[in-house]
């Protein structure tokens, strides 16, 4: 009798339902250990006739296989506003929770400093700069900062502009620049 029971259990230990359960258990473990992916986004702003009344500013946002944006900015038309607006647009369109890290590459050290350094002094001073004047571009800086402080997975990385290098980040920056200037070129051709 003992031999028959042993043979029965050996034969039926891995029946279909047991095998299915083991597969499902493995899937659950794998699902619990899924690592989120990262995303790399390149942003750029461009302004033709910067500082003049006839200035036209546009943005370029490039992220391979996710989205590419080329559009004119609203309001005052300056290069710095365009650089900031490109970052804001990228953050607004990205489902930040879907990624372990969101890398924003920009050639605008001004934009990075606004969001990661200078803003703390501005907030403490009631959004006044060192000369006690209202901070320029607050309307764009503040919403970027609000997104930045909400998520701990956003990283800003400064990259050199117009290098003609062929590494992946230089090429990504060139694509963002092309999108920003493409928009300006299209406007100028229509006018």
Per-segment meaning from a language model:
Residues 18, 26-85, 92-95, 115, ...:
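RNase H-like nuclease fold core
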Residues 2, 38-40, 153:
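A residue-level signal for beta-strand positions that form part of recognition/binding surfaces
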Residues 1-21:
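Short linear clamp-binding motif
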Residues 46-52, 88-174:
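RNase H catalytic domain
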